[in-house]
């Protein structure tokens, strides 16, 4: 019975319109900035004694940029800003987001060492099938992406393809698409390539295959309840009887390396009219004749705090999320995430050693600071380095210690600062272990790293025999190797 209920719940929100698609289509009905608009208010470079210890990736939607909420971004607490979005049509053409180019955001991000990612979207299953399977159209799309990256000095691409038409497209065509993209962009391995994936769908999606050809996956761990839901409930339940963020990461993504998972979290909530004051109450459809229209509206975090905290706030122990209720000739409920529930999700990312967390969406918190303070609390470590001239200027790979070793050893290396420009602020780093014949044994580091001194604890596989092994560091054109002795 539990399996049947789980399948029903997963199927329900799998066919629902995602927050990415819904907001994009809704905002198009409103006024937007003309092509070529540039907001002249530039963000200043932030000099702080903070260093992120995990990826903090945020989507910045064009409507939040148009409204000026990008001016509240704290760049020193972000590693990536994903411009949302460049829309792909069925022929491989790209439409820029309104107001493009966002020169103020790009300049401010790069001056603070933040990577700027272009998000390429399509929400039409037939169009996506054509983009993924037609060689000519696919290569045209890749070339348009490449030109955009080069022309605007961007640092990578995030593919957000939703509503794929069938299991074959999810399981096979999407993986082949990413494999071809990785091959197409081999000319510049520093470009990050990533894919936005659903929280559930292991039976239909090949998450491990997508991860193999991506630097990371942005797991959209929200929209568990939404406009389509027949009961109230959390957008992102940390825990739950059948479906939850925790279950998604542990079970649905069990075959994906944890360092390739970004845990997406919501900076928004949902508002319903209901038939009772109880959690998970039956909802009164806003429009009973329209699909995906059961709730009243989406509420950005800033709107929840501004307009609804005057009402009774409660905590749902089932999902570990807050909710609000009030009665005005009928019951109303708002379910959302706050700093308390988000901290629990961040703890999950830390405990599971995930690559980091991701935000839908930047700007949704307005000028409030509590969610930024939470990121600082969970994902930064103090550092005395506040000026570029104090950062290392040379690559170094140090001898491991202890050596010989068993069961583990420490490896240290440095990534330098290069005053020639922002491109050197974060560099692609690999640290691998090989046997004496050159066979790869372990991947210790495979990530983008900011300038600094790094210390890694290496524990070899249990089956590794006694012997001499080589650990090799690669950063751009720089390569260094050293030997170590493992005694079993």
Regions inferred by a protein language model and the residue ranges of each:
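Glycan-recognition patch characteristic of GH18 chitinases/ENGases
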Residues: 17-147
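C-terminal outer-membrane/trafficking sorting elements
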Residues: 389-401, 405-488
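Substrate-binding surface in catalytic domains of secreted glycosidases
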Residues: 90-100, 143, 163-304
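Conserved, mostly hydrophobic/aromatic
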Residues: 81, 159, 217, 263, ...
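Glycan-binding loop/region signatures in secreted carbohydrate-active enzymes
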Residues: 23-49, 265-347, 379
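Positively charged n-region of N-terminal signal peptides that target proteins for export
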Residues: 1-4, 488
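Sec-dependent N-terminal signal peptides
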Residues: 3-13
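Short, compositionally biased serine/threonine- and acidic-rich segments at solvent-exposed termini, linkers
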Residues: 381-388
């Amino acid at each position: 019975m539990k399996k049947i209920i789980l399948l029903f719940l997963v199927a329900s929100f799998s066919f629902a319109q995602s927050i990415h698609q819904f907001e994009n289509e809704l905002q198009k009905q409103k006024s937007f900035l003309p092509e070529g608009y540039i907001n002249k208010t530039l963000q200043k470079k932030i000099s702080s004694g903070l260093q992120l210890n995990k990826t903090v990736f945020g989507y910045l939607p064009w409507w939040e940029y148009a409204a000026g909420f990008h001016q509240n971004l704290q760049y020193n607490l972000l590693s990536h800003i994903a411009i949302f979005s460049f829309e792909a049509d069925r022929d491989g053409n790209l439409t820029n987001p309104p107001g493009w180019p966002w020169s103020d955001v790009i300049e401010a991000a790069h001056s603070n060492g933040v990577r700027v990612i272009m998000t390429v979207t399509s929400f039409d299953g037939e169009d996506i099938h054509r983009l993924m399977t037609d060689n000519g159209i696919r290569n045209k799309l890749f070339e348009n992406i490449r030109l955009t990256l080069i022309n605007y000095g961007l640092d990578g691409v995030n593919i957000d393809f939703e509503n794929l038409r069938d299991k074959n497209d999810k399981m096979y065509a999407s993986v082949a698409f990413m494999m071809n993209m990785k091959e197409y962009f081999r000319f510049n391995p520093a470009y990050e390539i990533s894919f936005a994936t659903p929280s559930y769908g292991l039976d239909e999606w090949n998450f491990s295959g997508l991860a193999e050809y991506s630097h990371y996956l942005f797991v959209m761990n929200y929209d568990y309840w939404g406009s389509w839901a027949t009961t109230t409930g959390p957008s992102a339940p940390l825990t739950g009887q059948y479906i939850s963020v925790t279950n998604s990461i542990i079970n649905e993504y069990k075959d994906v390396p944890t360092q390739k998972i970004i845990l997406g979290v919501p900076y928004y909530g949902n508002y319903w009219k209901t038939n009772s004051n109880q959690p998970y109450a039956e909802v009164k459809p806003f429009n009973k004749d329209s699909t995906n229209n059961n709730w009243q509206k989406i509420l950005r975090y800033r709107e929840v705090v501004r307009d609804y905290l005057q009402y009774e706030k409660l905590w749902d122990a089932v999902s570990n999320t807050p909710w609000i209720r009030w009665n005005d000739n009928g019951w109303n409920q708002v379910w959302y995430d706050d700093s308390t529930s988000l901290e629990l999700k961040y703890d999950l990312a830390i405990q599971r050693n995930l690559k980091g967390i991701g935000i839908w969406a930047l700007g949704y918190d307005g000028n409030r600071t509590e969610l930024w303070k939470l990121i600082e609390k969970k994902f930064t470590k103090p550092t005395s380095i506040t000026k570029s001239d104090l950062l290392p200027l040379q690559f170094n790979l140090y001898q491991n210690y202890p050596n010989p070793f068993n069961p583990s050893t420490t490896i240290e290396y440095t990534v330098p600062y290069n005053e020639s420009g922002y491109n050197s602020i974060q560099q692609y780093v690999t640290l691998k272990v090989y046997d004496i014949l050159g066979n790869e044994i372990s991947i210790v580091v495979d990530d983008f790293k900011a300038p600094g001194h790094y210390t890694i604890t290496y524990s070899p596989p249990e089956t590794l025999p006694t012997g001499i092994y080589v650990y090799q560091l690669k950063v751009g054109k720089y390569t260094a190797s050293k030997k170590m002795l493992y005694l079993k």
